[in-house]
Amino acid sequence: MSKLYLIIEKLQIYFQLILWFISFYWLDFELFPYLLEDSIFFKFALGMMMMSCQVFFYQYLYYTIKVDSVFEKENENELQNISEKHDYSTCKKCNILRPKRAHHCRYCNKCILEMDHHCFSLNKCIGKKNYHFFVRYLIFAELNASYIFWITIYVCINYYSELNKISFIKYGLMIFASFMGSCGLFLYLLFQLYLNLADLTTLEYIYPTLRINKNKQIHN
């Protein structure tokens, strides 16, 4: 794997960490102080929603990264009915017999069970064992972006007189960024939910030849 790819991969991870830090800082230190001036009920309800959203966001992010969907040679003994070859495929790169929906990731250089895609921003392959964590991570990432968008607008409208010119520019940029992020995450989440209902992975959607055919053996 080239050094350039490794550098780009690390930059993507650092960029993601910076975005997480900015969203956390903006919610907790820029917006929340304004909300403290509102009614106790509103403050408590909104504060609990914001905190819960962030807790679940980081929880599912952790599990998405921690849980591995790798299928390696030592896992071959887990396969049953080896004689039924149509249930399995052979990886030419790993030289192992694996479940048919497993695919070889050229970035991880490993076979991934029901591989959906390689997530560059998380530096992790999304597959059978961590896919549901990834979808939940997307849900709470979308909620976080939506909270930032709407609460920033709320603060701008209700505390107009307290904001100076620099604050307006800063808040305007955050409204634009959170709106774009929220829309992008929402569309991507809808796409993943569609794939889930259709029983497809991202790879199978992009490359129809990878879709399961019970009467053929697939090699890749």
Annotated model-derived regions:
Residues M1-N220:
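Membrane-associated feature with strongest affinity for ZDHHC
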